[in-house]
Amino acid sequence: MRVKGGTVTRARRKRIMKLAKGYRGSKHRLFKTAKDQVMKSYAYAFRDRKVNKRKFRELWIARINAAARMNDISYSKLMHGLKVANIDINRKMLADLAVNDADAFKALVDEAKKALN
């Protein structure tokens, strides 16, 4: 007698089809294409978790640079000045200060300038 898989196969296919919900065209209708797309989606997710970190660092640096130049100093000089002044603050916090608390950022810039002179 031939075994058809029954509940196990249905459960496996249902799981894949549930993951493929919202995909376009046959990618959410047909099991084979849905399975391929779900696998591809996992690959994209894995890759983009790494890319995400790079993109945010880029964004923080752009924000810090813009705010620094408003205070007459370049990004690289600001970062070097902070290092010389032993001010250990990461780019995420620095960018947040630049956007939300301009006075505190200016105080840090002044400390960096003082350390460079």
UniProtKB/Swiss-Prot annotation:
Annotated Gene3D superfamilies: 6.10.160.10, Ribosomal protein L20 (1.10.1900.20)
SUPFAM superfamilies hit by this protein: Ribosomal protein L20
GO BP term, pick one: translation
GO MF, any single term: rRNA binding
UniProt-listed InterPro entries: Ribosomal_bL20 (IPR005813), RIBOSOMAL_L20_CS (IPR049946), Ribosomal_protein_bL20_C (IPR035566)
Keyword Signal among UniProt keywords: no
Cysteine pairings via disulfide bonds: none
GO terms under cellular component: ribonucleoprotein complex; ribosome
Keyword Nuclease (UniProt): no
HAMAP family: Ribosomal_bL20
Biological role: Binds directly to 23S ribosomal RNA and is necessary for the in vitro assembly process of the 50S ribosomal subunit. It is not involved in the protein synthesizing functions of that subunit.
Name of the protein this chain belongs to: Large ribosomal subunit protein bL20
Organism this protein belongs to: Limosilactobacillus reuteri (strain DSM 20016)
Organism classification: Bacteria, Bacillati, Bacillota, Bacilli, Lactobacillales
